[in-house]
Amino acid sequence: MMLKPSIDTLLDKVPSKYSLVILEAKRAHELEAGAPATQEFKSVKSTLRALEEIESGNVVIHPDPEGKREAVRRRAEEERLRKEEEERKIKEQIAKEKEEGEKI
């Protein structure tokens, strides 16, 4: 049975097979917890989805701990801004519906 993505392709993306296992496990946990996907998947299982993301280069190991912290901060800020925008749109919709209701 041939595994997709292949182990050889994946090992080109990370320094060692141990790093690959850790990266795959962490990303699979993130996906299970509801983290946004970086691409469309062929696989159903989160572990295989994580490997697909690693193969495509969308998920990488940060050799620099500060770089990882910055990426986490940036992701948290993007999520905060997305939620604020969503709340703003909901409030606008409520105000619009309320205004239309008062006109009747």
Swiss-Prot record:
The species this protein was found in: Streptococcus sanguinis (strain SK36)
Keywords on record: DNA-directed RNA polymerase, Nucleotidyltransferase, Transcription, Transferase
Catalyzed reactions: RNA(n) + a ribonucleoside 5'-triphosphate = RNA(n+1) + diphosphate
EC number: 2.7.7.6
Family label: Belongs to the RNA polymerase subunit omega family.
Gene Ontology BP annotations: DNA-templated transcription
Enzyme class, first EC level, given as a word: transferase
HAMAP family, alphabetized: RNApol_bact_RpoZ
NCBIfam families for this protein: rpoZ
Stored InterPro entries: DNA-dir_RNA_pol_omega, Pol_omega/Rpo6/RPB6, RPB6/omega-like_sf
Assembly with partners or alone: The RNAP catalytic core consists of 2 alpha, 1 beta, 1 beta' and 1 omega subunit. When a sigma factor is associated with the core the holoenzyme is formed, which can initiate transcription.
Chain residue ranges for the region called Disordered: 60-104
Signal peptide positions (record): none
GO cellular component, one term: DNA-directed RNA polymerase complex
Gene (name only): rpoZ
Function noted in UniProt: Promotes RNA polymerase assembly. Latches the N- and C-terminal regions of the beta' subunit thereby facilitating its interaction with the beta and alpha subunits.
Composition bias, Basic and acidic residues: 63-104
The organism's place on the tree of life at top rank: Bacteria
Listed Pfam families: RNA_pol_Rpb6
SMART domains from the UniProt entry: RNA_pol_Rpb6
Name under which the protein is recorded: DNA-directed RNA polymerase subunit omega
GO MF annotation terms: DNA binding; DNA-directed RNA polymerase activity
